[in-house]
Design a protein with these regions (language model features):
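Metal-dependent phosphoesterase signature
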Residues: 64-88
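Extended, low-complexity cationic-aromatic segments
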Residues: 7
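Short acidic, Gly/Ser-rich segments with clustered Asp/Glu that frequently serve as metal-coordination loops
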Residues: 10-23
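Flexible, glycine- and charge-enriched loops at secondary-structure boundaries
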Residues: 24-26, 74
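Metal-dependent phosphoesterase core characteristic of DEDDh/y 3'-5' exonuclease domains
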Residues: 2-4, 26-69, 90-230
């Protein structure tokens, strides 16, 4: 049976600290969730786009400057995080593969909220494809500090590379970024460069899926920054 997919993007209340577990004190909260459901041929089935009502947390000024979200707007238009988590978990439980631009970030945001809610974080169930990592060797953008290798491209850089015009109006909303990730995923699939899904590895999880093979037959680590708490 062919895989079905769900494109995931999140906006958060502040910047994430990847050196800490997803649900550690001080980690940012989910503020905006976007999901785009795809069939096995990457055709859109439906989408899901919701703001999250704060339950005591606030928006960091830096995050607000990027995503335009405010506590007032989220309080007025948001839904309880529990409702959003039910939608997300249903997608994973039904076997969909998560596709995201920086899947390590978005799945960790979701994992933190699931843990706070006392739910299964679905670490082992969340098969995912990170199109940001897949585009790193495609874009080949050098580091500016002289470091060897290529840096992870920004979403706009990856879109420009494949000939897609980055959206300026509404940029950095979860749905706009999810649509960008979808465009990149389709390009990778068309060019037979879409990685096979894998489970992200994190520190203290050495027994999990060791590699995320590419369609070309080459294997790469499931994440370049695996030595981090889950």
């Amino acid at each position: 049976m062919s895989d079905r997919y769900v494109v995931l993007d999140t906006e958060t209340s502040a910047l994430f600290d990847f050196s800490k577990p997803a649900d550690a004190e001080g980690q940012p909260r989910l503020a905006h969730l976007a999901l785009i459901y795809l069939d096995s041929e990457f055709n859109v089935e439906r989408d899901y786009d919701v703001l999250i009502k704060p339950d005591g947390w606030t928006i960091d000024a830096g995050a607000a400057a990027v995503n335009g979200l405010t506590v007032e707007r989220l309080t007025a238009d948001g839904i309880p995080v529990a409702e959003a988590l039910l939608e997300y978990t249903k997608a994973i439980e039904t076997g969909r593969v998560v596709v995201a631009f920086n899947a390590q970030f978005d799945t960790k945001v979701a994992r933190g909220e699931l843990r706070r809610a006392g739910m299964d974080d679905m670490f082992m169930k969340t098969r995912n494809i990170c199109v940001m990592r897949a585009m790193t060797d495609v874009c080949q953008i050098p580091y500016t500090n002289g470091r060897a290798g290529f840096k992870f491209p920004k979403l706009a850089e990856a879109m420009a590379h494949i000939g897609e015009m980055p959206v300026t109006e509404g940029a950095h909303t979860a749905m706009v970024d999810a649509l960008g990730a979808l465009a990149i995923a389709r390009w990778l699939r068309t060019n037979q460069m879409l990685p096979e899904p894998g489970v992200h590895l994190a520190k203290k999880r050495p027994d999990l899926v060791p590699t995320q093979p590419r369609r070309s037959g080459k294997a790469k680590p499931a994440a370049a920054t695996d030595e981090l708490p889950a």
